[in-house]
């Protein structure tokens, strides 16, 4: 379901992987339907008028946007929800969201946040990448192995913001919220061990993260983690079923109960 931010590389890898695995391929371009939604909402993407335009002319205009003008949450959410709408109207939706995204609220509410069953709900992002590489090297060979390794090495991005004129991607998840290897480390010690932020910072130093990041960078990412973890509870209070894998789970029905209006101030002051 290509949208305004879909890159040629990710679309190619998805298509080729399905071909190699013998799956049926069905492509639905969501740009026209999203454009009509913008019109219905009277929304001006990135402040651009839609009068007398088509989605193609809008895309051409968005390619010229400077980097500091490529921010529009409604533009992103419409695309994410359009994909979920199409999927749910056609069949049983298997969720793709993982534990890290759930912890950080890195999803669109009632879009990729929702499904009929979420198989990765307790698998952190770093483990997802490890498993893709493991399967590539131990279960497949040839083209499938090559494609899976390319997917694992692809910069993490929702690809919802418009591409530049040279079709380059301008949206990096880790560039926005920080490295997932730090977030997953924080998540484990915060939820599984109940560690205070000050102890988590100490443990991060013992884990040698200071070889890759400065103490200030680690502390900044931890603050981001805490703020987003508390702010995202309302999303975790409404999630589909899924299996528990490992020792950390954020299911509101089993392992994690938390009020959606909890205040992170006490935790933030402990750094």
Describe each PLM feature range.
Residues 1-271:
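ATP/NTP-dependent adenylation/nucleotidyl-transfer catalytic domains that generate, transfer
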């Amino acid at each position: 379901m290509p949208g305004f931010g879909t890159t040629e590389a990710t679309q190619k890898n998805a298509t080729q992987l399905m071909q190699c695995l013998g799956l049926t391929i069905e492509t639905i371009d969501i740009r026209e339907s999203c454009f009509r939604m913008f019109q219905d909402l009277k929304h001006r993407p990135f402040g651009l008028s839609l009068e007398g335009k088509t989605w193609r002319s809008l895309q051409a205009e968005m390619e010229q946007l400077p980097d500091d003008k490529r921010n529009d949450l409604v533009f992103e959410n419409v695309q994410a929800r359009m994909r979920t709408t199409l999927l749910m109207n056609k069949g049983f939706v298997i969720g793709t969201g993982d534990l890290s995204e759930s912890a950080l609220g890195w999803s669109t509410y009632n879009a990729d946040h929702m499904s009929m069953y979420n198989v990765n709900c307790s698998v952190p992002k770093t483990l997802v990448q490890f498993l893709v590489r493991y399967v590539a090297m131990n279960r497949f060979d040839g083209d499938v192995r090559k494609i899976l390794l390319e997917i694992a090495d692809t910069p993490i991005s929702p690809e919802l913001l418009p591409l530049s004129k040279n079709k380059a991607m301008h949206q990096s998840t880790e560039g926005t919220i920080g490295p997932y290897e730090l977030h997953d480390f924080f998540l484990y010690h915060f939820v599984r061990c109940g560690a205070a932020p000050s102890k988590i910072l100490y443990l991060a130093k013992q884990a040698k993260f200071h070889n890759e990041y400065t103490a200030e960078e680690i502390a900044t990412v931890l603050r981001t983690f805490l703020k987003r973890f508390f702010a995202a509870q309302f999303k975790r209070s409404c999630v589909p079923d899924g299996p528990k894998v490992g020792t950390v789970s954020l299911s509101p029905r089993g392992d994690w109960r938390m009020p959606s209006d909890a205040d992170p101030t006490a935790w933030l002051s402990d750094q």
